[in-house]
Structures are given as C-alpha cells and as structure tokens.
Amino acid sequence: HLRNHFGSKPHKCRKCNYSCVNKSMLNSHMKSHTNVYQYRCADCTYATKY
C-alpha cells in the first residue's frame, strides 16, 4: 500500500517503458503486447484482450 504514496513502481515491462505498483497490473498490461484475444462475443465478431 505504501508504494502508492511514495511513487515506487518496481514492476517494469520488458517490452516498453510501462511500470506499475503490483504484479497483477503488469500481467494485465502484458496482454497488450500479444495478439491473443481471450474474450469473444458469442453474437458478433467483437473480441477483446481484457
């Protein structure tokens, strides 16, 4: 919790300059570097990574 107050962002992306406070946020961000679309609409062609 204190990292939020002090601006510490120890989790850094290896592919861009993104950094964040916790590992789960980094894991979510890493999906932006892939072409995998996990969530697809059953009724149309819409798909999203998140």
Curated annotation (Swiss-Prot):
GO molecular function, one term: DNA binding
SS bonds (residue pairs): none
Locations listed in the record: Nucleus
Highest taxon of the lineage: Eukaryota
SUPFAM superfamilies, sorted: beta-beta-alpha zinc fingers (SSF57667)
Gene3D superfamilies given in the database record: Classic Zinc Finger
GO biological process terms held by the UniProt record: regulation of gene expression; segmentation
Keyword annotations: Developmental protein, DNA-binding, Gap protein, Metal-binding, Nucleus, Repeat, Zinc, Zinc-finger
Main localization, broad class: nucleus
GO CC entries: nucleus
InterPro entries per UniProt: Znf-C2H2_CTCF (IPR056438), Znf_C2H2_sf (IPR036236), Znf_C2H2_type (IPR013087)
ZnF start-end (C2H2-type): 1-5, 11-33, 39-50
The protein's role, per its UniProt record: Gap class segmentation protein that controls development of head structures.
Family: Belongs to the hunchback C2H2-type zinc-finger protein family.
Name of this protein: Protein hunchback
Organism encoding this protein: Lithobius forficatus (Centipede)
